[in-house]
Structure formats: C-alpha cells, structure tokens
C-alpha cells in the first residue's frame, strides 16, 4: 500500500472497492497488514474506486490514543487519496470518533478533470465546511 516506506498497511485495515466502467459488478478487496489480499468478493459498487481506511494506528496503542485525543487539530491533515472518479467523505468514523454517524460525501468534478480540480474541490469543501461550494 502507500505511506512512508510503504508501511501504511501495517497501521490500519485497508479495503478497496472498485468497478470498471465496462463491468456489471464491482470487486471488493480486503488486505491484511502485510499487504496480501485476504478476501476478494463481488461487490455492488458504482463506477470508480473507493479506498477505505479503518482502525488507523490500531496496531500502535499509544499512537492511536494520541490520534483520538488530537483529532480535531489534525483533521485538516487528512486529504486522503483521490483520483479522477472518487468521493471524499468528510467526517468518516475513522476520522471523527466523536460523531461517527455524521458522513458528508464530497464529490469531485465530473470526468474528465485534473488533479488540481480535485484538490481544490476537496480542500475548499473541508475549509468552508459542510454544504459549501467553491
């Protein structure tokens, strides 16, 4: 997976759900902490790819507690991976343990668009709060 020296996979649970434009059904891949696929199943998913990161720092209890304690300060530091066809979920349970039920989808501009457009869309939404636009 990604991260400093490709070790992010060891710090959390990673699931990738994807569906190609020509496919009738998507695929869900669940990875273990060594980066090996432990489950590959058909999954109803819209066109595109979603990367889910859960239990961030769960393998490092001290780091996990520090993360939970400082989540409000560190919130702006989580741009998450995004590409041309993806969504940004502001307030996912992994990010905000205080309010786990509040999810606000942030969609990137329609295809085709540049990486710069995606960054502007995601960060302007986070900076200006829920329901804001560029």
Curated annotation (Swiss-Prot):
Organism encoding this protein: Homo sapiens
Additional record remark: Encoded by one of the numerous copies of postmeiotic segregation increased 2-like genes scattered in the q11-q22 region of the chromosome 7.
Xref: PANTHER family: DNA MISMATCH REPAIR PROTEIN MLH, PMS, MUTL (PTHR10073), MISMATCH REPAIR ENDONUCLEASE PMS2 (PTHR10073:SF52)
Family affiliation: Belongs to the DNA mismatch repair MutL/HexB family.
Name of the featured protein: Postmeiotic segregation increased 2-like protein 5
Origin: domain of life: Eukaryota
Organism ancestry: Eukaryota, Metazoa, Chordata, Craniata, Vertebrata
One record GO biological process: mismatch repair
Cellular compartments per GO CC: mismatch repair complex
GO molecular function, one term: ATP hydrolysis activity
